[in-house]
């Protein structure tokens, strides 16, 4: 029976989004995983938490209950567009200071709260980015009309705190920018970005969990607009992706320090990619349907692997080795760097199969020559099979 008295694994979310598909699916998957592995589990809503510092020590109360056994891993889902450093991030920092392993960590979430902050983190690492300008002050949009002209028109204009494709414009010329300056809300700054014409109305959404690409989806606008977000009526379809594209998504995830993220890549005529955005609170309802994946289940598996349990650690270690062996034995999916991205096939198989299926399939073939090369690994595999 699953207990919440001394929970090892928590799911922490926000009341405003807890009924959304990703949160409900992650809760389902975590409950199932913890019951399967006989792990203690607790679901917590952000506004139930009271933070304490008593006698110089950090403490925690939930709905009046003094917490004495702290979670080892906390899966975090907070609405990044509305994240407040004085409340939400304070709770996450408190848990992290108490020794809890958060996924994602508070700094990783902050790296994605503001689109320009994301680019600041990625700059200097050799990551291909569209040229981008922003500004200080609260109402300096108008002064950027001249400053950003070097980016050439048309240019992309985005609210740095926007989400789901909202508050994104394609400015035709300086007059259009001037009109926008009178229409937009100025609570958050805007960024001005070089337009990648060849990727108009389409991009590639890559979901990365634990430093591994779990799947990729081509998103296309259906009404001619620049944004391809499924929440705005765009359609998503499973696609293959070149090794360059996969490695770029993993690199971005690593630089930003994210355990779970969605990376959006813009496509160029020469088959290369540049980064559009990174999402710490990635949605995956369209992704699950298009790619026939259970992203929540993959997240739950990874969360369990972070617990200090020998069996779980060996299991995910094996999964990593199996995945590497599988990837190196198959031909590269997606267009090579010299081929236009238009050749990406929406009917191709997914980049990475479901981790559980991959593991089960390969375990049935053991012992094989590859695994006999390492006796220690073979012993661990035998433990799992038994």
Curated annotation (Swiss-Prot):
Which residues of this UniProt protein bind Mn(2+) 1?
Answer: 264, 277
Q: Which organism is it from?
A: Homo sapiens
Q: Extract one GO cellular component term from the record.
A: cytoplasm
Note accompanying the cofactor annotation: Binds 2 magnesium or manganese ions per subunit.
Any Pfam family from its record, for instance, is RimK
Domain ATP-grasp, chain residue ranges per copy: 119-304
This entry's Gene Ontology molecular function terms read: ATP binding; citrate-L-glutamate ligase activity; metal ion binding; N-acetyl-L-aspartate-L-glutamate ligase activity
Q: Which residues are the signal sequence here? A: none
Q: Which intervals of the chain are annotated as region Disordered?
A: 325-359
- Compartments, as annotated in UniProt: Cytoplasm
Chain coiled-coil ranges: none
Q: What is this protein called in UniProt? A: Beta-citrylglutamate synthase B
Output the superkingdom of the source species.
Eukaryota
The similarity comment for this entry is: Belongs to the RimK family.
Gene that encodes it: RIMKLB
Q: Cofactor(s) for this protein?
A: Mg(2+); Mn(2+)
What reaction does this catalyse? citrate + L-glutamate + ATP = beta-citrylglutamate + ADP + phosphate + H(+); N-acetyl-L-aspartate + L-glutamate + ATP = N-acetyl-L-aspartyl-L-glutamate + ADP + phosphate + H(+)
Q: Where does Mn(2+) 2 bind?
A: 277, 279
